[in-house]
């Protein structure tokens, strides 16, 4: 039997102002077998002076955030940073927070590939 996978949009492409953060839509995996969560950060022509960070959380209930993985982007003008986090099958709820650096806006987006049946 073939596996069933579902694409999810957690955060549509949007500008994130300097020194601000955004939370992606929570991903409910309580009836799924895990997921890959991908975040894309694009710096503008004026790069941030402090690297933006992406934090992936898992939790046993909706809204619970227990840090699974954190990664930082770069401070290079016009660069694109893609980060992928493998959410294991025991993960029930997934949250992603993107924190921008101190100067200049960036563009952010987040997607997931959910394994729904095996």
Regions found by a protein language model. Give the residues of each.
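Short loop/turn segments immediately following beta-strands, especially the blade-tip
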Residues: 60-61, 117
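Noncatalytic modules at the cell exterior or secretory-pathway interfaces
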Residues: 33-39, 87-106
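Short beta-strand segments enriched in hydrophobic/aromatic residues
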Residues: 41-43, 98-100, 112-114
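C-terminal edge strands of extracellular/lumenal beta-sandwich accessory domains
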Residues: 103-118
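Surface-exposed ligand/attachment interfaces on beta-rich extracellular proteins
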Residues: 11-31, 42-55, 61, 75-82, ...
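Surface-exposed loop/edge segments in extracytoplasmic proteins
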Residues: 7-12, 62-71
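Short, intrinsically disordered N-terminal pre-domain segments
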Residues: 1-16, 114-118
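Mid-chain, well-packed structural core segment of small domains
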Residues: 67-69, 79-86
């Amino acid at each position: 039997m073939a596996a069933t996978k579902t694409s999810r949009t957690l955060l549509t492409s949007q500008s994130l102002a300097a020194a601000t953060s955004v939370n992606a839509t929570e991903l409910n995996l309580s009836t799924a077998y895990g997921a890959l969560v991908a975040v894309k950060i694009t710096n503008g022509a004026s790069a941030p002076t402090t690297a933006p960070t992406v934090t992936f959380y898992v939790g046993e209930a909706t809204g619970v955030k227990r840090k699974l993985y954190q990664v930082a982007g770069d401070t290079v003008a016009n660069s694109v940073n893609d980060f992928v986090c493998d959410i294991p099958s025991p993960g029930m709820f997934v949250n992603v927070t993107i924190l921008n650096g101190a100067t200049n806006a960036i563009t952010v987006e987040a997607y997931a590939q959910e394994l729904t049946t095996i």
